[in-house]
Each structure stands twice: as C-alpha cells, then as structure tokens.
Amino acid sequence: MAELKKLGNRAPSRSSYFGIVDLCGFKKDRFYIYQAHWRPDVKMAHILPHWNWPERKGQVTPVHVYTSGDEAELFLNGKSQGVRKKGTGEKDRYRLVWEDVKYTPGTLKVVVKKDGKPWATDTVTTTGKPAALTLKPDRSEIKGDGYDLSYVTVAVRDAQGRMVPRSKNQLTFKVSGPADIAGICNGDPTDFTTMANPENKNIMKIKAFNGLAQVILRSRKGESGKVTLQVISNGLKPAQTTVTVK
C-alpha cells in the first residue's frame, strides 16, 4: 500500500493509473503528448485541465498545452495569457505551460503556430450542470454470430450539449432485442462495479466517471433485428439508440 501511495495511486485499485487510455479505451490527457511527439505532421492542440473548478475561483491554476506546433498563445475569456515556445529542456520540450493563470469561469482558447504560420486551436469551456445523456455506438450494425460487439459511449452533458467533465451520475442501462449487455465500464480504476455480465442481464448500472461511461452490446447467435439501448439517470434527460443485428 505504501508503494502505491508513493506513486500517487489510491488503493485498492483494479488497474494502474498510468497509460494513455483508460479501461474503456477513452483517451487520457497524456495520449496527446505522445500524439504531438510521434505525429508532428498532424495539426493538433490539447488543453488541460478541463475548466470546471468552482472551488478554485481566483486561485492560480496552471494550464498545459500539448501540441505538434512550436509556439502558442493562450487566451482566457479573450484576454491573452502570453505566448509560449517549445525549447530543448525537459520542461518545455514536450509541452507548453502557463504557470500563473488564475481560475475564472469561462473559456480557455489556445492558438498554435508552426514555423510562424497558423497550425491548430483548442478550446475548453466551463460547463453548466448535468442535464442530459447521450449515446454513441461505434458501430450501428453487427453480425448475428453471438460474438460481434458494438461499443456504446455514454456522455453526461449540460443544457448546451457540452460534456460535463466532473460528473459522476448513476446510470442505468436497459437493452431489448437480439443482443445482450456484454459488459459496462467507466474507466475509473477505483470503481469495483462488476463490469462483466455472464448472466446476460438486460439491466445494468454504473456511475459515470469524468462525465463518461461505456456499455458493450453483444449479438445473439442466429438472431437478427433491431436492438434498443436506453440509459437513464435521476434528474437527467434520458437517451436511446439502436443497433441493427444482421
């Protein structure tokens, strides 16, 4: 336990805190530092952290940017926070950092240049409270062989449709039609909710983590037709999506 605490991990945990994607395959912030370094040809910029910190109003909150460009200007609510350029040192070789940004709700925007020319932008905005759910399957058609899967991403969103990054609402999934819930996940290494569904229950529950969760649908062998997946959460507008089994 002591060693885990030294590494910054809470225990018990079902997985490591390291890596560039979580248990669901959702990209962590660190994903983008590797993308920027390994794919310098891809125009990209990524701001971190998110900008939902009501308890930090007026406090210094450093902002980092991962980018394949070589210099960037950061704006908070339209006001420039200065320009940063990549260097050769350990600190500024892979990221650009604004150490003295004071948290104010609103919008962070970074404008990146490469070789003096416009390259990429990124924006993060303070969101409202959770208001609705959305579902997005990675595949809308799967084979009826009893093995094919559709991974469905669940997002908690505010009234303007923006994903709420700190939300952890309890989610309930219900499926009907020629497919079963193969498993659920939220990417939280400290959440020990059962992910697998060996009994093929048509209802499962899990909390959102950082505004996201995932449900995996598996086709039934020899069956075809339309599968309906619903997700509900107390106080939020529910969501529904369909997947076709052929």
Where are the model-predicted features located?
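Short flexible loop/turn segments that cap and initiate beta-strands
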Residues: 60-62, 68-70, 74-83, 121-123, ...
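Short, hydrophobic beta-strand segments
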Residues: 96-103, 199-221
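Substrate-binding clefts and catalytic carboxylate motifs of secreted carbohydrate-active enzymes
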Residues: 1-147, 159-160
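Short, conserved beta-strand segments of beta-strand-rich sandwich/propeller modules, principally
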Residues: 105-109, 151, 226-228
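Short beta-strand elements
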Residues: 120-129, 236-246
